[in-house]
């Protein structure tokens, strides 16, 4: 009603309807799609200091955490070459300074070597989750308040950023024995969705 969401209607595959009335509604969708679909007023990002009156709050309330499309690499052992195909629009400079072993023409490299960078995401079975924020596979963008076609283009950009980082690890960092593990039932072998 107006600028307040007082519940929701759900329709299942049998065309049965369930109506839920609520005093308080929390949008639990990944990207706030329920409130947007309802036409309700909502905020995204961190609270602006002008709103919260907190001195330590940021001034830009549209700051949204970067999205990451995680991947799992497996160490296939010395001599293995698991190098993936060069991703479309690959740009190695996006990954410069990700660690001390990487080229770093401007600024300072993140203060770990390539092995420690992979160790950050180590999981059992000689596998490594690739989720590296420092010049790695974090993807900056607003995936909220955009139409489905533009959102899918942006999400494809995030997938390509992760594939590019994997390619960089394998080629520029010389770690070609680390290949995509067969962990996810997806064509690209990346996680089913970003976080």
Regions found by a protein language model. Give the residues of each.
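Flavin (FAD/FMN)-binding glycine-rich loop and adjacent Rossmann-like elements that form
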Residues: 2-7, 11-195
